[in-house]
Amino acid sequence: MAAQAAGRPLRLAHRGVHGGALGHAENSLPALLAAVPTGCDGVEFDLRFSRDGLPVIIHDETLARTHGDERAVSELDASELQRLGVPTLTDALAALPDALFLDLELKVPPLPSFFAALRERSMDAGAQLVISSFDDDALREVGVRAPQWSRWLNVESPSAEVRARALALGVDGVSVEKSLLGSEWVADLQAAGLELAVWTLRTREDLAYLSHPGLVAACVEGEAR
């Protein structure tokens, strides 16, 4: 993964800069682009796949919460999703500055179009890019098809198997829920040589987590941006 920014953790706008005064919807193109003037080092966004197999930027399995539509993302073609305001990965890569660090969270295992979209944008070397996921199969597939890209295993709760999973997958690091920082469990993961990232910092008080030793990146939103 890219080095820390000037010796500090990278700050990644979680699902872009959404809500608040700007009113941008999470994971929308305006939200992703709004990360640039905030001074964030990069953006984090979620990826699923349309019915016609293209990577699209949305967190949930269905459109209900974000778009008021009960249909599943996988039931619609990418063009239909775009008309509803769901961008494709290609849309985002074309619009975002090359210098912006990208944390691409795969909600499901990737299809070939995912790798093609990134390679078309000359991101094959893996610079300024990390692939994160809670899904072991997704991380395993990326490791096989694009071993040059950094990978993080996302972790929500402590478990004795996480260290073994991470090492077996050969990931570069773990991205953990903020309340886990400072625990012996996290220290053990770092001692095993795994990079450490954290999610999601939302308040000014949460900014204290940025001083955690060895932290390389943090997903931020709201006051913590």
Predicted regions and their residues:
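Phosphate-group recognition and catalysis centered on beta-loop-alpha active-site segments
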Residues: 1-225
